[in-house]
Amino acid sequence: MAGYLPPKGYAPSPPPPYPVPAGYPEAAALHPGPGQAPVPTQGPAPAPGFSLFPSPGPVVPGPPGPFVPLPGVPSGLEFLVQIDQILIHQKAERVETFLGWETCNRYELRSGTGQQLGQAAEESNCCARLCCGARRPLRIRLADPGDREVLRLLRPLHCGCSCCPCGLQEMEVQAPPGTTIGHVLQTWHPFIPKFSILDADRQPVLRVVGPCCTCGCGTDTNFEVKTKDESRSVGRISKQWGGLLREALTDADDFGLQFPVDLDVRVKAVLLGATFLIDYMFFEKRGGAGPSAITS
């Protein structure tokens, strides 16, 4: 009624608070008054046997997956597209170290950043290692981390001294196995080791020029990768010094191969074959009479 006045002494009371469901924070905690600090609250408790926000377990890195096929790149050579350096580590064999018996060489390949690229293994017979030593004919199979053969290197038997034009060494490079993509051919020179990097049509693409002395006592031994007219260096094959004890007791060597990142992957693969050929020609034990080979 308009103009109604409450009786004297009457004071209106506030309405009763609305009941808050169990598990929800109090309103005062969510909306603190002036001068009050907010009170941390907890969300509703999960039901027994369940977690509100399950946390993932530790992430375990799996094996590297296969490389994505690229147009214009031979199958299996995709790992060479984005790299400009390959580190080659030859595994030391205990039988070879302690008994002096020559075994099939095995290698591990990594990129300059440490990524595993694959494994390489020699295939040769005991008679060839016994009679021919470092000049033995052989086949090297390079497999990717998934154990798929992606590269095959074939070295025929060439008799005679490498300083004679009739005894020049050669390595054929196949990728995929069965398809020749290039050759490594030793170029005759009376004092300096030289090699020609040839394409599938045996046309020269690059040259590899080594030092006059390849002993490299205490230092790395470098073979320069040059243009086909030898006017400019574009890469390097380095046999890394492994220390006096290792060099004296084993012929397990470490190599570093450097090339331009935009170089054709086929040429990169042929340079890899040149690295293996250089290892056998200059840094492998020389064969001879006696027990210098063993079946592995």
Curated annotation (Swiss-Prot):
- Cite the entry's keywords alphabetically: Apoptosis, Calcium, Lipid transport, Lipoprotein, Membrane, Mitochondrion, Mitochondrion inner membrane, Nucleus, Palmitate, Repeat, SH3-binding, Transmembrane, Transmembrane helix, Transport
Entry membrane topology: Single-pass type II membrane protein
Q: Provide Mitochondrial intermembrane-side residue ranges.
A: 1-266
Q: Which GO terms describe its molecular function?
A: calcium ion binding; calcium-dependent protein binding; lead ion binding; magnesium ion binding; mercury ion binding; phospholipid scramblase activity; SH3 domain binding
Instruction: Return the Low complexity bias intervals.
Output: 1-11
Q: Where is this motif: SH3-binding 1?
A: 7-15
The UniProt entry annotates the motif SH3-binding 2 at 21-27
According to its UniProt record, which cofactors does this protein need?
A: Ca(2+); Mg(2+)
Q: How is it modified after translation?
A: Palmitoylation regulates its localization to the cell membrane or the nucleus; trafficking to the cell membrane is dependent upon palmitoylation whereas in the absence of palmitoylation, localizes to the nucleus.
Q: Name one Pfam family in it.
A: Scramblase
Activity versus pH, per record: Optimum pH is 5.8. Activity decreases at higher pH values.
What interactions and quaternary structure are annotated? Monomer. Forms homooligomers upon binding to Ca(2+), Pb(2+) and Hg(2+) ions. Interacts with PDCD6 in a calcium-dependent manner. Interacts with PRKCD; interaction is enhanced by UV irradiation.
What the protein does comes down to: Catalyzes calcium-induced ATP-independent rapid bidirectional and non-specific movement of the phospholipids (lipid scrambling or lipid flip-flop) between the inner and outer membrane of the mitochondria. Plays an important role in mitochondrial respiratory function, morphology, and apoptotic response. Mediates the translocation of cardiolipin from the mitochondrial inner membrane to outer membrane enhancing t-Bid induced cytochrome c release and apoptosis.
Q: What is this protein called?
A: Phospholipid scramblase 3
Q: Which gene encodes it?
A: Plscr3
